[in-house]
Amino acid sequence: MIPLPIRPLSHSEFAPFGDVIEPDDAKSFPINAGKCIRYHDLARVETSGPEARTLVSLLKGEPYDIPLTLKMVERHPLGSQAFIPLTGNPFLVVVAPDEGGEPGEPIAFETGPGQGVNIAQNVWHGILTPLRSTSEFVVIDRGGSGCNLEEHFFEKPYQVEYA
């Protein structure tokens, strides 16, 4: 197996693949007579293709153990996919650059408390992978007709592990 070290999730390193979703004081302002702070426009939700619409769903995922064998990644050519945790539990985010229609070398990130991600349209990524305990997520992605899922199975799997 090919070793794949986990690194902390950061805005700058994740930027080529989408958005890190977390409170950002630079994009905040008070609403509701000052009783609420709005953290505004934290992710670009993308939907395209026939009858495209934005979906909001809830997921409850069981935890995975590290080290983890990564055999497959997927992508959604017709829309982005956001995962926003409802708990402070970390989760693993694996992404890979596109190299001629196939995934390149994957990168593994672990989220910090309260961080979510929006994986941009057509970006190769791993499946939702909660760590340490069962976790619930709000998922924002695309509905509508058309094929919005491509999968790629690696010839040689990766072993995702803490550095």
Swiss-Prot record:
Disulfide bonding pattern of the chain: none
Annotated TM spans: none
Reaction catalysis annotation: (S)-ureidoglycolate = urea + glyoxylate
A GO biological process held by the record: allantoin catabolic process
Pathway membership: Nitrogen metabolism; (S)-allantoin degradation
Subunit structure: Homodimer.
Record PANTHER family: UREIDOGLYCOLATE HYDROLASE, UREIDOGLYCOLATE LYASE
Protein name (database record): Ureidoglycolate lyase 2
Gene: allA2
